[in-house]
């Protein structure tokens, strides 16, 4: 039997009961940046996004693209360089400042009037705006609607108990004709507490299926040596494309 196929077709766990009460605070996420525990950051960008970029963009120009829990994702620069307008939200000010520094972009910063303590960082070119605040506070900032959402490291990072609220916010930000690209991870949740959390396909359909057509574009075995420390022996990344029903 083909070993790769065996891994990629591994049976999904029916629910996330074992992880449902797991909670990380915003302060804990900020501490991850300070202590450099940011293994989720991909310096070369996301391979599956690169591969399916044309499917995601559909050859359209001047799109508004949203990055939830953006960190310092290099893909934000990719989209900006293609002429699109990028908006991200990230709780770590350190992560946002590192993005601009590492991409050699000058920027301005100002307070978010609607969110006490929040800040918005804007590239001097004007096509990248990063909000430093909780994603769950973001609706108060009236950031408008988006043509595209790239959700990698966001749904899998928020506390499982917050997923319904998260999905409602994401869908409220979509514009007619939107494309939403989601990357999730499949592993044995009884062996790793997360994050990243395990999000089964059934829950994805429950959260987004009433509004979206859901199509799995690809499954990839992404298991690496570092994952052994999680106590797991396989991890599959799945890429989904949501389109408007």
UniProtKB/Swiss-Prot annotation:
Substrate binds at residue 40. Its EC number is 2.1.1.67. GO terms for cellular component: cytoplasm. Keywords: Acetylation, Cytoplasm, Methyltransferase, S-adenosyl-L-methionine, Transferase. It catalyses: S-adenosyl-L-methionine + a thiopurine = S-adenosyl-L-homocysteine + a thiopurine S-methylether. The modification N6-acetyllysine is found at residue 58. It holds the Pfam family TPMT. GO terms for molecular function: thiopurine S-methyltransferase activity. GO terms for biological process: methylation. SUPFAM superfamilies: S-adenosyl-L-methionine-dependent methyltransferases. It is found in: Cytoplasm. PROSITE patterns: SAM_MT_TPMT. S-adenosyl-L-methionine binds at residues 29-40, 69, 90, 152. PANTHER family: THIOPURINE S-METHYLTRANSFERASE. Monomer. Belongs to the class I-like SAM-binding methyltransferase superfamily. TPMT family. This is Thiopurine S-methyltransferase. The gene is TPMT.
């Amino acid at each position: 039997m083909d070993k790769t196929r065996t891994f990629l077709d591994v049976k999904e766990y029916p629910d996330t009961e074992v992880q449902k009460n797991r909670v990380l605070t915003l302060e804990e996420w900020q501490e991850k940046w300070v202590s450099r525990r940011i293994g989720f950051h991909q310096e070369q960008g996301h391979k599956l996004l690169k591969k399916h970029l044309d499917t995601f963009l559909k050859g359209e120009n001047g799109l508004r693209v949203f990055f939830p829990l953006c960190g310092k994702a290099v893909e934000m620069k990719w989209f900006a360089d293609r002429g699109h307008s990028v908006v991200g939200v990230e709780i770590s000010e350190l992560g946002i400042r590192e993005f601009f520094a590492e991409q050699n972009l000058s920027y301005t910063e100002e307070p978010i009037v609607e969110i006490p303590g929040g800040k918005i960082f804007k590239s001097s070119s004007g096509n990248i705006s990063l909000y430093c605040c909780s994603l769950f506070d973001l609706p108060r900032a009236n950031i408008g609607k988006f043509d595209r959402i790239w959700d990698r490291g966001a749904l899998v990072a928020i506390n499982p108990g917050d997923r319904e609220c998260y999905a409602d916010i994401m869908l409220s930000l979509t514009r007619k004709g939107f494309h939403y690209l989601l990357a999730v991870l499949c592993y044995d949740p009884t062996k790793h507490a997360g994050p990243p959390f395990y999000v089964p396909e059934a829950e994805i359909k429950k959260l987004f299926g009433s509004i979206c057509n859901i199509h799995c574009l690809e499954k990839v075995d992404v298991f690496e040596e570092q994952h052994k420390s999680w106590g797991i022996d396989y991890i599959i990344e799945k890429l989904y494309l949501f389109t408007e029903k």
